[in-house]
From Swiss-Prot:
Keyword check for Ubl conjugation: no
BP terms from Gene Ontology: glycerolipid metabolic process; lipid catabolic process
Protein name per its UniProtKB record: Lysophospholipase NTE1
Organism: Scheffersomyces stipitis (strain ATCC 58785 / CBS 6054 / NBRC 10063 / NRRL Y-11545) (Yeast)
Topology Cytoplasmic: residue spans: 1-45, 103-1546
Active site: S1272 (nucleophile), D1390 (proton acceptor)
Main location: endoplasmic reticulum
Residue window of motif GXSXG: 1270-1274
Domain PNPLA: 1239-1403
Enzyme Commission (EC) number: 3.1.1.5
Function: Intracellular phospholipase B that catalyzes the double deacylation of phosphatidylcholine (PC) to glycerophosphocholine (GroPCho). Plays an important role in membrane lipid homeostasis. Responsible for the rapid PC turnover in response to inositol, elevated temperatures, or when choline is present in the growth medium.
Length: 1546
């Protein structure tokens, strides 16, 4: 026992030792505790033994048992026996499972992202327009609230356009002596515009004009009568026996005085004529000796108790007015505050209380005189502004709208019949010498004598001889006559004595004659061209002629230099023109301009007129420094220097209106208290004339003078031209002809409608108004039919430059013009309002009173209607009183929701707004919002009614305008009624004929200049009169500080307005940095903004460009189109929607092929990652370098050979790289000019294959296509053409689709249980997807749309965005055959059920010409008569009876089909009658709807039909004049007609 125990202990020790060495420390048995009992030791070893046994067992199972079992299982042999049927079933099951997995998991991957796609976040353009509009309205409200914090009087004065551009010093000079006058509700103001300039500060003033006895207005116009025209009780005012007609209502902040009256306030008082001028304005005869009328206390009018307002010591008493002179002394203009009725509760009664009154501010006459004396250049700016208003507002309205052009031309008739003109003849020796040289023995020689060639060439011996003579006599004072050079001249005193043309007041200088002076040529060319005399370009001073006296002995010489006959002639002509224009050297305005330095003195220069302030000993005289016009009409300097804070005085006299109603009108009139009518003008004269060299002015004018000779019946100026100039008739006469504007008149009859107005004789001037005012020529100027004419011509550009240089001439010229204007024109000018509406401003709101209508002078307005009946607009008038703040008072931004607004259209330049509401005395039906900074001329209702009574032709013309608008509206309504259902996804048509186009880049570095050049060339090619403006070209006209100074805004606005008058389209090129003022100007001036972007720039596509951010901050209302520039005609699928996703300010987009030259180090544009390229680069990096270099060499050789092959193919005669009719810039130009060509392809199943042939014929004949729309099969062919714009790809893809649809097996496998449809639509869907892929409609190169029938909402939907295959499939979904496409919860079917030929929708897109191809089945209109009952057996027998006379009765399927296409048939008939539609229907009636297997046959039917038709049209001249097919720019320039297209074969 002991031995066994020891043996176990030894074994345990050995195992313990072994395990301790083998097992890790964590599994090793722990050492026994020292000094333990044997019992514990035994237990310890037993536990350890059990643990060891468990470990060994586990190791045995893992290492031995499990592997042995696996080996035994693998070594077992067994057999499975299956029969053939089991194997086939198993294989069928496996194949079916695999097919279902591939079919429904992988092959339907094209539609996994298109189940309910909302066009990737693209917002409806109409909604974005309204959203931006409301933002603009909120911005306007914020701006208006900010403006109200300023001084109200300064705000009113700054808002007036005349004073808005002046410097602060000039502005303060005008306003420091301004006074105010308060009027009670019963006071009538006698408005004397010669006392000062008045502005309404508070309240509303009603302005009345006097009605003369011989006027038609007074006849039968009784205010007590219930007259239709007199629906306002305040239209007529009676003072004494004089009747006054309401002219206008002037609101707070608007000028009460006429802006033309500023000319009288600025005119210096230098003669007694001022007194007569003032009295003449009140019809007081100059023969009346006003000084004999005693000045006594004011007396009452014939009606008792009427006085001239409150008595004031500063106002002199009025004279006694004798009864015989009463009617002459009634003022022309009176004004009174407008009554405002308010309801007031007094106890139990309701009373109407009239709370009214007004406050006016007056800038006195003396303030204008101080400005005229101290700031002559600022005076010229005011005069320029007055003329600009006269041109833009008055003349435009009178000529274009009212049709009173003859009234305007009466001023030129007066000019040429005044005594000053009759005395403005040339000296006899100059006149005879000129006639002797032009009308020689050979007759009239009309040789064109260029100004440059006159002094660069020597053409005869006589000229050389003359040159020698002149060089020897440089210091002579003789006038060298050309007659002395003739060998046959016998000589006389005039040829040997000194001659002078100097008058008593002209200081003259002479000029040496050039060697090749045209006046001394021995012979003139005989060609019928213009002959002109030009002056040397030297800066030497010239002589002037005395225009009144012919006594040569009284003349002296002006200089030490010799005066030639040419210089004498030129100066004499200039002096004659000056006398006609009203420019006199003796005038006070000329004497005040001492030390004048042309173009160098600033507006506020303190040295202007400095010599007037110096005494004889060159010391400053404080007394002389005072303004010489401190008193006027009895007003002392203390009276006129009352500040604004002083107590208001009675500046104007008034009478109490209440006394008018209490007085009994009698026949006798004893007197009237009008104190301002008889005041005499007293002005201090400067006795010592100042030194001023007026000869420089005449010399510079003479340099620009051209003497021309025209033959008989030669048109010199065409009506409507801009660059006419001033024509002074030296000999002969000019006929002034006028052609009434009639847009519907054929051009061949326009020549017959020319009517002669008057003739300009010798000594007269033609082209006066167009030169002085800057207006386009209203008449045609032509020489007489019997003989020619010799004229002296100053071009309009030269005249404008000289007037800008010598700005002090503008005041006398403008004053002379005002005297020539008729009283009717001045009345119209006084009543017309010049409205300035900023971008986003509201011209008028829906619901406003229509108290006037507007004519758009510049800018653009968007018409918006609120569809909610709960909206009520303001009841205030819709007028905009000359400044932006008043226009915002009717802004309904807080009451308008986006969903309630509807954009109806836009008004552009020259269009009129609101006549219907005015004639019907109703409220505004729409709201008008300015798209950009705009200007309108407002004609008040009262002025229109007054002019209509005196000139019935105005009412006739306005009635025609209104009737034409009504007819046009009826046409639109008729077209909308023809389409029974209104499309749910399109807005009303907005005209694309934009006046101004802005080209703006998204980021810097884009080729803006190159893009603009190509677009301008395209616009010219389609026949548009276009000009491109960039900062450099604009600075050329306006100066280098055009966009930095406040004054430049006036010139800038006038320059842009002039360009809008002269050109059809203006392209603004934004080629400046982001913070430049020109960038903001371009954005604010654009009717349409073209936003350029690089299509491959992913950074900008997902973000926003710097220029776009500025565009958003400026809150422009203009339409914004995104132009994506591509290096080639290819758009990566899905790339366009990335650009349009977040750009809600973009309403459209265009794909343009244009190469962008990028710099090598440019990293701003990131290319899209290409998986294959990245994989190739990774593999190439790990490849052996030798293999890599070999492959690179092979690749380079392949590329070079491909380039050579492509080059030879491109330059071959059978192919042309860029076809002109596919020019993207011509397409863009047509769209922007409303000249787009649309292609509409109808539905018809397999018959639509003929569309491919027709498109091929269009390509062959070079007919461009700008817009494409389609239905059913037409949507498929149209989508292919819009996607690739290539006939080759269209043919191949359409044929591929036809083969798939015609496949019988594909149709059989696609059959399903016919609950909704016979087939599932899978094969049909996949066939469409195979040719379109994941391309979206936005990716199509040409703008495209297709229509579908929404059977959920019972509407027709138009699709212009989204996956193309999906909506094309929806447009082709024939009910019963294919299931509807589900989109956003709606079911979409074939669009042919509502409109199988969507011409109306294409018309909404702005297409002018529409090529509509109809391939639908022919309508069976056979009459049926089978009685009231019908037996099915009889119908069956009738079908099989060959002898039956009854037509076959349709079955149930046919009836359902006809019922489904009822709306489409009506829409087709309306489409045929639409203007501009080219209706085509190829002979395809013999083909069924599903005959897709006959592709080639149907294709050739369409091709042959269209090819023959277009060829015959081209041969017979019936093809419409589509813009771009012929280069109209070259035709205008006189080149031969060049066709831009050529035939191209496939």
């Amino acid at each position: 026992m002991k031995d066994s125990t020891e043996a176990l202990n030894s074994i345990a020790f050995a195992v313990d030792t072994t395990l301790s060495s083998i097992l890790p420390s964590s599994l090793a048995p722990p050492s026994a505790p020292p000094a333990t009992s044997s019992f514990l030791k035994s237990i310890w070893y037993a536990f350890w033994w059990l643990w060891s046994m468990v470990v060994f067992k586990i190791m045995n199972i893992i290492l031995l048992y499990i592997p042995s079992k696996i080996m035994n299982a693998l070594s077992i042999n067994f057999e499975i026996t299956l029969n053939l049927s089991s194997i086939l079933v198993a294989l069928s099951a496996i194949i079916t499972v695999c097919f279902l997995v591939v079919r429904y998991k992988y092959l339907t991957g094209y539609s996994k992202d298109t189940s309910d796609r909302k066009t990737k976040g693209k917002v409806n353009p109409s909604a974005s327009n309204i959203n931006l509009k409301n933002q603009s309205l909120d911005y306007v409200d914020q701006k208006k609230g900010h403006r109200r914090t300023t001084n109200y009087l300064d705000e009113f004065l700054s808002a007036i356009k005349v004073f808005g551009y002046l410097e602060k010093s000039v502005f303060h000079e005008l306003t420091k002596n301004m006074t105010t006058q308060k009027l009670s509700h019963d006071e009538i103001l006698y408005l004397d515009e010669k006392l000062g300039f008045s502005i309404v500060v508070e309240g509303v003033m009603q302005v009345y004009t006097r009605i003369t006895e011989n006027s038609n207005v007074s006849g039968g116009f009784d205010p007590d009568d219930d007259n239709e025209l007199n629906y306002e009780k305040d239209d007529v005012l009676i003072i004494g026996n004089q009747r006054y007609q309401l002219l206008n209502e002037v609101k707070s902040g608007a000028p009460l005085s006429s802006l033309v009256s500023v000319l009288d306030l600025l005119k210096p008082v230098d003669s007694e004529d001022s007194t007569s001028d003032m009295l003449h304005s009140f019809n007081i005869s100059d023969d009346d000796n006003i000084s004999k009328i005693p000045e006594i206390s004011p007396i009452s009018l014939p009606f008792q108790g009427i006085h001239a307002g409150a008595k004031d010591d500063s106002v002199p008493p009025s004279p006694i007015i004798r009864p015989s002179k009463t009617k002459q002394l009634y003022p022309e203009i009176v004004a009174r505050p407008k009554s405002r009725p308010h309801k007031e509760h007094t106890g139990h009664h309701l009373h109407h209380v009239h709370h009214s009154g007004a406050t006016i501010a007056i800038i006195p006459y003396s303030a204008f005189q101080r400005v005229q004396s101290k700031y002559p250049k600022a005076t010229s700016h005011i005069v320029t502004m007055v003329l600009a208003r006269l041109y833009k507002v008055t003349f435009n309205t009178i000529h274009d709208y009212l049709g009173l052009t003859k009234e305007i031309m009466e001023s030129e008739v007066k000019l040429n019949t005044t005594s000053s003109v009759r005395g403005a003849n040339l000296p006899g020796y100059l006149f005879d010498g000129l006639l002797d040289k032009i009308y020689g023995a050979n007759g009239i020689n009309e040789a064109s004598l260029s100004r440059k060639s006159d002094f660069q060439r020597a053409s005869s011996v006589n000229l050389n001889k003359q040159k020698t003579t002149l060089c020897d006599a440089k210091s002579s004072r003789y006038v060298l006559l050309d007659s002395r050079l003739k060998s046959t001249h016998p000589g006389d005193l005039l040829s040997s004595v000194p001659l002078s043309r100097r008058s008593d007041y002209y200081q003259t200088h002479s000029h040496p004659l050039s060697a090749d002076d045209p006046l001394v040529r021995s012979a003139f060319p005989s060609s019928k061209t213009l002959s002109s005399l030009s002056s040397p370009t030297s800066n030497l001073k010239r002589a002037s002629s005395n225009l009144k006296f012919e006594n040569i002995r009284d003349r002296s010489f002006s200089d030490d230099r010799e005066e030639t006959e040419e210089t004498s002639l030129r100066i004499a002509v200039v002096e004659s023109i000056f006398k006609i224009l009203g420019i006199s050297e003796k005038s006070t305005a000329m004497r005040n301009l001492s030390s004048f330095n042309s173009g160098r003195s600033s507006v506020s220069s303190s040295i202007v007129g400095l010599s007037n302030l110096m005494s004889a000993d060159d010391k400053f005289d404080t007394n002389a420094a005072r303004v010489r016009f401190d008193s006027y009409n009895g007003f002392s300097s203390t009276a006129t220097s009352i500040s604004r804070s002083s107590t208001p005085i009675k500046f104007y006299n008034t009478i109490n209106q209440n006394q008018l109603h209490n007085h009994h009108m009698g026949d006798s009139v004893s007197g009237i208290n009008i104190s301002t009518l008889s005041r005499q003008h007293q002005a201090n004269r400067n006795s010592s004339p100042t030194e001023f060299n007026f000869a420089n002015v005449k010399s510079d004018f003479a340099k620009c003078l051209e003497i021309k000779s025209y033959g008989p019946n030669t048109t010199i100026v065409e009506q409507g031209s801009f660059n006419s100039g001033l024509y002074y008739v030296i000999d002969g006469s000019l006929d002034v002809l006028y052609r009434p504007s009639n847009h519907g008149e054929p051009s061949s009859n326009r020549e017959d409608n020319l009517k002669k107005l008057y003739s300009v004789k010798s000594g007269g001037v033609a082209g006066y108004l167009s030169s002085v005012v800057g207006f386009r020529s209203l008449v045609t100027i032509r020489t007489s039919k019997k003989r020619g004419v010799i004229v002296a011509h100053i071009s309009k550009s030269d005249y404008s430059k000289l007037m800008d240089r010598y700005y002090f001439l503008q005041l006398p010229v403008a004053t002379k013009l005002k005297k020539l204007l008729s009283p009717q024109i001045l009345t119209i000018d006084y009543a017309l309002e010049w409205c300035h509406i900023p971008a986003g401003g509201v011209l008028c709101s829906q619901g406003d009173l229509a108290n006037g209508f507007h004519i758009v002078l510049s800018g653009r307005f968007r018409v918006v209607r609120n569809k909610s009946d709960r909206y009520q607009g303001n009841t205030s008038d819709d007028d905009i009183l000359g400044f932006s703040d008043t226009s915002m008072d009717c802004s309904p931004s807080s009451d308008i929701n986006n969903e309630d607004l509807e954009v109806l259209g836009e008004y552009g330049h020259g269009e009129s707004i609101g006549e219907v509401e005015v004639l019907t005395a109703s409220r505004r039906t729409n709201s008008l919002i300015a798209v950009r900074d705009s200007e309108t001329a407002r004609i008040p209702r009262t002025l229109f009614e007054m002019l209509s009574l005196s000139n019935p032709s105005i009412m006739v013309k306005v009635s025609r305008i209104v009737a034409s608008k009504v007819v046009y509206k009826d046409v639109l309504d008729q077209s909308s009624r023809n389409s029974t259902l209104i499309p749910s996804s399109t807005a009303s048509h907005i005209s694309n004929d934009y006046k101004t186009i802005t080209i703006l880049p998204t980021v810097s570095g884009l080729p803006v200049r190159e893009f603009a050049d190509k677009l301008v060339s395209a616009l010219k090619a389609i026949g548009r009169n276009v000009i491109a403006l960039d900062q450099a070209s604009t600075l050329t006209h306006l100066g280098r500080h055009a966009f930095d100074e406040r004054l430049a805004q006036l010139k800038l606005s006038g320059y842009f307005a002039y360009l809008e008058e002269e050109y059809e389209t203006i392209v603004y090129i934004c080629d400046t940095p982001l913070k430049s003022n020109w960038t903001s100007t371009c954005i604010s001036q654009g009717d349409c903004i073209l936003l350029l972007a690089d299509a491959e720039d992913d950074v900008v596509a997902t973000g926003i460009g710097d220029y776009e951010r500025l565009l958003i901050n400026l809150k422009t209302m203009a339409r914004t189109d995104l132009c994506l520039l591509h290096p080639e005609k290819y758009v990566e699928p899905g790339s366009t929607s990335i650009w349009l996703k977040n750009r809600i300010w973009v309403q459209g987009h265009h794909h343009i092929e244009m190469e962008i030259i990028r710099k090598k180090d440019e990293n701003s544009v990131k290319k899209r990652p290409n998986i294959i390229s990245e994989l190739a680069s990774k593999i190439g990096s790990k490849t052996n370098p030798s293999i890599k270099s070999t492959l690179e060499d092979v690749r380079l050789k392949a590329i070079s050979s491909f380039v050579k092959l492509n080059t030879s193919f491109v330059h071959s005669d059978r192919y042309k790289a860029v076809q002109p009719h596919k020019n993207d810039f011509l397409r863009l130009a047509r769209i922007l000019s409303n000249e787009a060509v649309g292609l509409v392809l109808g539905g018809g199943g397999s018959r639509g294959i003929s569309h491919v042939g027709i498109v091929t014929a269009l390509e062959r004949h070079g007919i461009p296509v700008d817009l494409i729309g389609g239905t059913s099969i037409g949507s498929l062919v149209g989508g292919l053409y819009a996607k690739d714009y290539n006939i080759v790809s269209i043919y191949g893809r359409a044929k591929k689709f036809s083969k798939r649809v015609a496949s019988l097996w594909r149709s059989v496998f696609d059959l399903t249980y016919p609950v909704t449809s016979y087939i599932t639509g899978y094969e049909f869907n996949r066939g469409i997807w195979k040719i379109f892929g994941f391309t979206e409609i936005e990716d199509f190169w040409i703008r495209y749309f297709c229509n579908t029938t929404n059977i959920t909402n019972s509407t027709m939907d138009i699709h212009e965005s989204g996956y193309s295959w999906r909506f094309i499939r929806a447009s082709m979904s024939l009910a019963g055959l294919l299931p509807p496409i589900a989109f956003q919860g709606c079911m979409l079917l074939d669009g042919g059920y509502l409109d199988n030929l969507p011409v109306s929708e294409m018309k909404k897109k702005g297409a002018k010409y529409i090529i509509a191809v109809d391939v639908g089945s022919a309508d069976d209109r056979t009459p049926m008569n089978y009685g009231d009952t019908l037996s099915g057996f009889w119908v069956l027998f009738n079908r099989w009876n060959p002898f039956s006379k009854h037509p076959n009765v349709p079955n149930m399927m046919d009836i359902q089909m006809r019922l489904a296409y009822v709306a489409s048939v009506n829409a087709l008939e309306a489409a045929k009658k639409t203007n501009g539609v080219i209706y085509l229907r190829p002979p395809i009636d013999n083909y069924a709807t599903l005959d897709f297997a006959k592709f080639d046959e149907i294709y050739h039917v369409g091709l042959n039909y269209a090819d023959k038709l277009f060829s015959s049209w081209s041969k017979n001249g019936k093809l419409p004049a589509i813009a771009g097919m012929v280069d109209k720019a070259k035709i205008k320039s006189g080149d031969d007609k060049k066709v831009l297209y050529r035939r191209n074969s496939i």
